[in-house]
Every structure is written in structure tokens, then in C-alpha cells.
Amino acid sequence: MKFLVVDDFSTMRRIVRGLLKELGFLNVEEAEDGVVALNRLKSEPFDFVVSDWNMPNMTGLELLKAIRADAALAHLPVLMVTAEAKKENIIEAAKSGASGYVVKPFTAATLDEKLNKIFKATGAKEAA
């Protein structure tokens, strides 16, 4: 399973990559914003997107909406990762088609729980 981790903060990308590795997911690529991510998604196959909310150029929410609007990408599970625990953000993400939502900071166990819920809902594999 190939993941794309999208975050403008390189340390956060490394943290998420490390947590995914801890969970057995070794095929992880990175993008620093939504524009780069969308270009990568359109040019190479990915199975799962983990995206930050607040980024320059194209926010995570804008990326999510672009993914859902593209017939070739609309099936991709998207887990939104953010420091924003505001109810309205969670509702907005859900309305826009987010597969899940996790608030920073989080542990490998929390990430595992969120991923497994999404895998169960989408019928995707739970192993790398």
C-alpha cells in the first residue's frame, strides 16, 4: 500500500512517515503542499493520502475537494491531520469527503485506530 503524506512542515512529514513505518507501512512518499500532492496523485498511483489541513498554496481541505472532484482520484481514502480540533473544521472535512480526521499530536496507536476504521469502511487492506 502506497501512502502520500502531505504537510508543509518537513518534521511533521517525518513523524507521520515514522508512525506509518512503525505500523508496517513502508511505501510512503511526501509532498510539501496540496499543489505538489495533487500533481503527484495525478502522475503516479497512490492508495492512501494523509494530509495536513493548514498549508500554503493549497490547503488540505482544498486538496481533499480536488481529490473528490477528480473521477480518477475520488476513490482514494484521505485522512486529515490537523492541530485544529474545532468542531466546524471536523464537520467541514466530513462534508467534503474526508475518510477520517486526527488531531495533532497523536500516537501510532491513534493513527492505527483511524487507519483501521478507514480500511474497514473502504474494504482496503490492513497490512502493507
Regions found by a protein language model. Give the residues of each.
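Alpha4 helix (beta4-alpha4-beta5 surface) of REC/receiver domains from two-component response regulators
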Residues: R17-G18, E62, A85-G100
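Short amphipathic alpha-helix used as the core "switch/output" element in two-component signaling
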Residues: N39, L61-A74
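Two-component/phosphorelay signaling modules centered on CheY-like receiver
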Residues: S10-E29
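Helix N-cap/capping motif at the beta->alpha junctions
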Residues: E30-N39, G60
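Active-site beta3 strand of CheY-like receiver
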Residues: E44-V50
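Receiver (REC) domain active-site loop signature in two-component systems and cognate sites
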Residues: M55
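C-terminal output helix
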Residues: F106-L115
